[in-house]
Amino acid sequence: MREESISTETVILVHGLWTPAAVFALHGRWLQRRGYRVLRFGYPSVRGTLSQNALALKRYVAVRIAPGIAAPIYLVGHSLGGLVILDMLRHEPDPRLRRVVLLGTPCVDSHCARRLAGMAGMPALLGRSIIEWLSRVPGVVAPSRAAMEIGVLAGTRSVGLGRVVPGLPRPNDGVVALAETRLPGAADCIALPVAHSEMLVSRHCAAQIAIFLQTGRFQHDEQV
């Protein structure tokens, strides 16, 4: 194995509901330009349960990043992908995991998902991961392991599903309310004027992701 492959820090990108791993293509390229090794984890967001997908992510980390590689591992998850990450972190995660960035993840609840789940035929469309998550007691707490830092990035541009699902609290990103993203125990959080899906193509988001992966904090000014 080459020396650079042993020392390179890895970022694993985890997509959200109804989307393939390819939706993180831009962020993948941007992170590679910063010197990271980038992997995109794909999973059945509709067919698989949250528990199954979290276990699959844990196995993916173990298989794709050999135990002999000591370099830090970072995770970035969009929406449901963030919930998969949080669920995986509850089960003795790899000690090399250092930082996590959650993009538009409904950490504590989801008004849109609960409203849709109550409509005929919608539970099957939302999928088993979302339904399992909704069945749990609301409220998620960040892992307590001291070496783990989690950053929460939320959007405030209300464009999307929220316009047809009544009652979504403001501010929101069109799908997830800002208040729903607030993860107790997170190292830092930031709100940007982007919509839910826009996070996947936003250079502003990319810059904040990179800053958090490097420092464990976002940059809270106008210079990003």
List each language-model region with its residue ranges.
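Short beta-strand-to-loop junctions in surface cap/lid or active-site-entrance loops
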Residues: 1-8
